[in-house]
Amino acid sequence: MKGSPSKGGFCPDAATPLLGRGVAFPRESGCVLGMNILLGIFQISLEQGLAYALVALGIVVSFRILAFPDLTVDGSFVLGGAVVARMIVLGYPPLAGVFLSIVLGFAAGCATGLLNTRLRINSLLAGILIMTILYSVNLRLMGRSNTPLINYTTLFTPFEETEARWLWVTLFFGAIAFGCKFQTDQIIHPQLGLDKRAKGANEQMKRSQGLNTDHITVLGLGISNAFVSLSGGLVAQHQGFADIGMGIGMIVAGLAAIIIGETLLRAKTVMRNTLAAIVGSFVYRLTITVGLWLGLAPTDLKMATGAMVILALGLPALKRGKEERFHLRGI
């Protein structure tokens, strides 16, 4: 079968496009999975993985370091896309929109933290409340449920004119993802960061030493949602639109990426946890891409992701229960 080049990579004839501006994969029976197809799968997975790595990195800060089940993520991701889309449509530079998305994402995370620490609202409920409020805020920002950016200048417009578009876009996402990872490591390793990690592990001990864990929680959630909002702003520009539903299931996808990464890297330190978020994001997107190529319906992706997380979280408990039963039986 002959193939023809495309913007995203190798596109065999009679192929079904995947993920819009990405690579197209063959759907005809008997088509040989050649090196070009493998390269295409790798390219789109790496590009998408690095684009969403900031979501996983933000969830690492809230779930792993702060031990705070923050559900604001689904709303703050859309917030980033909505802010950037609105700013670009109004004629502002894309970089200004990205900066504002970071600021507002940080504010959204801090709001969740303040509801929990000042008003003593349950952590899950605090996240749900802010996420619900953000739904209306995002609609107000965009003015409608979907804002296309195809005909506007974005941060990725200069890459469209280059032959190695995929390479430059991947390097761009990679630089941002690893830059945020190293900044997170620098924040965590000094004394404030050690307090954050201890806050999640033993809050009563830190309070007994006179440390204000409430401030740590608010700051940590702000940083977490700033990362997520930044990711939303970049993804909206990359895919060419911002949509009110683009954040649905984002927290589950981020958790899946973290679980995969921590399993592969056996992450037991903060630096490994942040690296696991990036690696896991790539592997997760690789799994999704391969699943789509094999015929998995796009409508089933959320269900498959949820099942993956349930399996990963439930297996250790089942294993421990089995070992305890064997121990009681004297086996």
Regions found by a protein language model. Name each.
Residues 108, 163-251, 256:
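Helix-loop-helix "hairpin" substructures at the membrane interface of multi-pass membrane proteins
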Residues 183, 201-208, 212-215, 268, ...:
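Cytosolic-side transmembrane-helix boundaries in multi-pass membrane proteins
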Residues 123, 127-130, 134-189, 218-219, ...:
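Transmembrane helix-bundle core of multi-pass membrane transporters
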Residues 40-93, 98, 114-119, 259-266:
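Single transmembrane alpha-helix segments in multi-pass membrane proteins
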